[in-house]
Amino acid sequence: MKHLIFSSALVCALVVCTFAEEQVNVPFLPDERAVKCIGWQETCNGNLPCCNECVMCECNIMGQNCRCNHPKATNECESRRR
């Protein structure tokens, strides 16, 4: 009986942790969007090729996928990336 209760508690904890992990999705704040060159180097660490042409780039938590919100018009951000 103890094993059944322990197993049930473990499964419930795992489900709660998995659900909480999926809810972590913090978008850019409105005041961050107004600042040039923010987002892609801080959110994506400037190391992802898919963010090279972006002023603001959002990544997933693993840093494998990104979405360019505002393409660069010039190379004004290039020096900040280094």
UniProtKB/Swiss-Prot annotation:
Q: Residue span of the signal peptide, if any? A: 1-20
Where is this chain lipid-modified, annotation O-palmitoyl serine? S79
The UniProt record lists the keyword Secreted: yes
- Cysteine pairings via disulfide bonds: C37-C51, C44-C57, C50-C68, C54-C77, C59-C66
Spell out the molecular function terms from Gene Ontology: ion channel inhibitor activity; toxin activity
Q: Which domain of life is it from?
A: Eukaryota
What does its PTM field state?
Answer: Plectoxin-5 presumably undergoes post-translational modification to give rise to plectoxin-6.
Q: Which GO terms describe its cellular component?
A: extracellular region
Enumerate the InterPro entries for this protein: Spidertoxin
| Functional description taken from the UniProt entry | Potent toxin that may paralyze and/or kill insect pests such as H.virescens (lepidoptera), S.exigua (beet armyworm) and M.sexta (tobacco hornworm).
Protein name as annotated:
U1-plectoxin-Pt1a
